[in-house]
Amino acid sequence: QVILTGYVEFFRGTPMLVQAMFFYHGLRPFFQWNALTAGIMIISINTGAYMAEIVRSGIQSVDRGQSEGALSLGMTRVQTMKYIILPQAIRNSFPAIGNQFIINIKDSSMLNVIGVVELFFQSSSIAGSTMSYSATFLITCLVYLCLTSIATILLNIIEKRINNPILR
């Protein structure tokens, strides 16, 4: 419990930019990974901390009477969690889970500090070579907007499916 709390607090309480620098440069003597691998690791670990907190709050949002009722019907704690609590918790948490996914798309731009070639990095290179900063970064904004819009549409479809008892 203490280790998990420390993990969540550390990664939620420090900027991803600093985490990326620490993982890539600070741990380089111990791990020989490239920038992309370090970037994927830091986004995954950072997201894991936020997702743990989202799921925890989702579980706590389920009325205590639900688990008491399941236990009184003879279900085990594992069955209660699997069949009663988690389905409701995921349904309650899905908007926050979707928001975290959208944030990940946008936060990937921070990985350019460790040399990951991504959209922002490419845009900066193009803008520097063409001296057309306004147009280049406007296009970059539109690409990010398209990516997040597509993700939002897909997440809304999934959320409707989750909330519709006929489609489940």
Where are these regions (language model features)?
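Transmembrane alpha-helices and adjacent helix-loop boundaries
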Residues: 1-168
